């Protein structure tokens, strides 16, 4: 009998989230425990999510029932950089509905978070997973696990046909697909298949719950929110990226060394990524713009600093699939180490089904606007256009034409 792609509970545990939310949460506990933040949900393609409001609220109530078991805490304790005080805090942590507001505004589903960063930070990934799975239950109720599994094996067949054995031996792929997964059961099934049958190197998952369950490595370092928040955390705006990186280094002392470059733009980031940081961090992560051009820029930066690029790693995570990953791998092979984090294309790619296109992003920190500009015009996000203009001015980022009106 074929198995349904859905289960009653969408979020399985407090660990059913991306690993970098926990690594950032620990840094927030130690450095910014009293800072307030605001987040807003946005459905990028205008899909009507209003009919799902009541069920989304019910799943949020279930989310707030979760706590970490002794087994969960024991798993985290084995991770060397998770500190005892953070483990004690997590043992007491519960999601609190006072910090999340759901409503219908202007005929759209509205989700807002407002509260202490320390207590709000873990909401993002499970909330997105809830919206995605509730919507999929209604739109595609008869979906079976076998459909997702067969699709993944088709991708493996393509990869083994188009890549050599030597290439496959070096091709490193990880799952980054929790937030927009079709369902929990689909992600769980996909990870089992990837662990056992992926023809290249399957190196782990960002999902901590499934890493524990399937004996995989949990992966992740920092997200845009870490750098965005520092725009309002005390230093001059021009020094905000440096402050974010410096705080990370003090927290992790050389561990978790993959830095995200495109919060403002990669050019602005590399201006701040001097020899000190370039030596301390293991590598960089790409999340917008042309991946090969970005990689060339990073390689050139390392070479100018006298650093061998082959001692560093570039992680790619922007809308990838296996053909794109293989193209990037071939363009950079032997010049710098590369790894690929694939999300929606692994956990929400089922024939005939359109995955969600949505984000839940930090909009304010300490009562003031924050922004992400990125290397791609369509990914710029801020509720205050004046702050975006000021950010561009301070970091000397030129205005770019919108994707709807190319120059």
Curated annotation (Swiss-Prot):
InterPro entries: N/Namide_PRibTrfase, NAPRTase_N, Nic_PRibTrfase, Nic_PRibTrfase-Fam, Nicotinate_pribotase-like_C
Residue numbers carrying Phosphohistidine: 224
GO annotation terms (biological process): NAD biosynthetic process via the salvage pathway
Major enzyme class: ligase
Transmembrane stretches, start-end: none
Keywords: Ligase, Phosphoprotein, Pyridine nucleotide biosynthesis
Keyword Transmembrane helix: no
EC number: 6.3.4.21
GO cellular component, one term: cytosol
SUPFAM superfamilies linked to this entry: Nicotinate/Quinolinate PRTase C-terminal domain-like, Nicotinate/Quinolinate PRTase N-terminal domain-like
UniProt pathway annotation: Cofactor biosynthesis; NAD(+) biosynthesis; nicotinate D-ribonucleotide from nicotinate: step 1/1
Known catalytic reactions: nicotinate + 5-phospho-alpha-D-ribose 1-diphosphate + ATP + H2O = nicotinate beta-D-ribonucleotide + ADP + phosphate + diphosphate
One GO molecular-function entry: nicotinate phosphoribosyltransferase activity
Post-translational modification: Transiently phosphorylated on a His residue during the reaction cycle. Phosphorylation strongly increases the affinity for substrates and increases the rate of nicotinate D-ribonucleotide production. Dephosphorylation regenerates the low-affinity form of the enzyme, leading to product release.
Role summary: Catalyzes the synthesis of beta-nicotinate D-ribonucleotide from nicotinate and 5-phospho-D-ribose 1-phosphate at the expense of ATP.
Family membership: Belongs to the NAPRTase family.
Protein name per UniProt: Nicotinate phosphoribosyltransferase
Organism: Pseudomonas savastanoi pv. phaseolicola (strain 1448A / Race 6) (Pseudomonas syringae pv. phaseolicola (strain 1448A / Race 6))
Gene: pncB
């Amino acid at each position: 009998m074929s198995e349904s792609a859905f289960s009653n509970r969408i979020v399985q545990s407090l660990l059913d989230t991306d690993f970098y939310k926990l690594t950032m949460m620990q840094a927030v506990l130690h450095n910014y425990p009293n800072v307030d933040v605001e987040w807003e949900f946005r459905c990028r393609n205008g899909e009507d999510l209003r009919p799902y409001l009541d069920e989304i609220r019910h799943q949020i109530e279930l989310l707030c029932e979760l706590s970490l078991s002794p087994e969960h805490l024991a798993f985290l304790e084995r991770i060397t950089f998770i500190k005892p005080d953070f483990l004690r805090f997590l043992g007491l942590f519960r999601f609190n509905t006072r910090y999340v507001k759901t409503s219908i505004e202007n005929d759209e589903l509205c989700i807002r978070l407002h509260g202490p960063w320390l207590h709000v930070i873990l909401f993002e990934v499970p909330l997105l997973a809830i919206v995605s799975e509730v919507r999929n239950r209604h739109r595609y109720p008869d979906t079976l696990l076998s459909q997702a599994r067969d699709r993944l094996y088709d991708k493996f067949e393509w990869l083994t046909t188009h890549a050599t054995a030597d290439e496959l031996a070096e091709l490193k792929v990880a799952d980054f697909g929790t937030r927009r997964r079709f369902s929990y059961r689909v992600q769980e099934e996909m990870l089992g298949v990837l662990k056992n049958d992926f023809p290249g190197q399957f190196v782990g998952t960002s999902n901590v719950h499934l890493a524990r369950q399937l004996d995989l490595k949990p992966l992740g370092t920092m997200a845009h929110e870490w750098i965005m928040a520092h725009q309002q955390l005390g230093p001059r705006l021009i020094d905000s990226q440096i402050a974010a990186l410096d705080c990370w280094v003090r927290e992790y002392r050389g561990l978790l060394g993959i830095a995200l470059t495109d919060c403002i733009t990669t050019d602005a980031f590399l201006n701040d990524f001097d020899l000190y940081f370039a030596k301390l961090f293991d590598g960089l992560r790409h999340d917008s713009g042309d991946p090969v051009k970005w990689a060339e820029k990073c390689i050139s930066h390392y070479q100018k600093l006298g650093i061998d690029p082959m001692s560093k790693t570039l992680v790619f995570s922007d809308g990838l699939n296996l053909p794109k990953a293989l193209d990037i791998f071939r363009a950079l092979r032997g010049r710098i180490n590369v790894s690929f984090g694939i999300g929606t294309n692994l956990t929400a790619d089922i024939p005939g089904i359109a995955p969600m296109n949505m984000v839940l992003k930090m909009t304010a920190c300490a009562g003031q606007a924050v922004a992400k500009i990125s290397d791609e015009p369509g990914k710029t996000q801020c509720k205050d256009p004046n702050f975006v203009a000021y950010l561009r001015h301070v970091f000397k980022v030129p205005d770019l034409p919108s994707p709807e009106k190319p120059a």
